[in-house]
């Protein structure tokens, strides 16, 4: 099955499928799955010597305000392969703005059927403070050496805000 056929989730917005593009702690290469072919492309080599602190991907059949599918960070005990799909539940959102406009990043944890390790995490405030700081720091600085690019992190919002973002983005894609 093509990644293009992966549904947005099992029970939106509570139970979502995240298509992974970049594994946690991988080399500083930004991969993107082409939304027309489903192929994994190298988007760019990051200029900063930094790595994504969590697996990074998106929710199919959604459309964020930046014109792309909803971005999602997924902490896991092990890095996930690019092109893999993981069942998750949203727990929060990191609100940010970059040179192109609003660019929110959802945080979602693996579904309980995949791991009980995250069952106690119901909201972004249940995540370890160090992990939240690493995520914010990464996004504040990963574009520092790219001319004309910048990011401003505005702060964390809760699970309800993440779910609202999913619903709005799913509707936006459906009505496009």
Curated annotation (Swiss-Prot):
What InterPro entries does the database record attribute to this sequence?
A: Pyrophosphatase (IPR008162), Pyrophosphatase_sf (IPR036649)
Recorded hits in PANTHER family, A to Z, give: INORGANIC PYROPHOSPHATASE
Cite the binding residues for Mg(2+) 1: 66, 71, 103
Functional description taken from the UniProt entry:
Catalyzes the hydrolysis of inorganic pyrophosphate (PPi) forming two phosphate ions.
Q: Where does Mg(2+) 2 bind?
A: 71
Q: Which family does it belong to?
A: Belongs to the PPase family.
* Complex formation: Homohexamer.
Keyword terms, alphabetized? Cytoplasm, Hydrolase, Magnesium, Metal-binding
The protein's Enzyme Commission number: 3.6.1.1
**Molecular function (Gene Ontology), one example:** inorganic diphosphate phosphatase activity
Highest taxon above the source species: Bacteria
What is the catalytic activity of this protein?
diphosphate + H2O = 2 phosphate + H(+)
Organism, as annotated: Escherichia coli O6:H1 (strain CFT073 / ATCC 700928 / UPEC)
Binding locations of substrate: 30, 44, 56, 142
Q: Which gene encodes it?
A: ppa
> Which protein is depicted?
Inorganic pyrophosphatase
Q: Where in the cell is it found?
A: Cytoplasm
| Gene Ontology terms describing biological process | phosphate-containing compound metabolic process
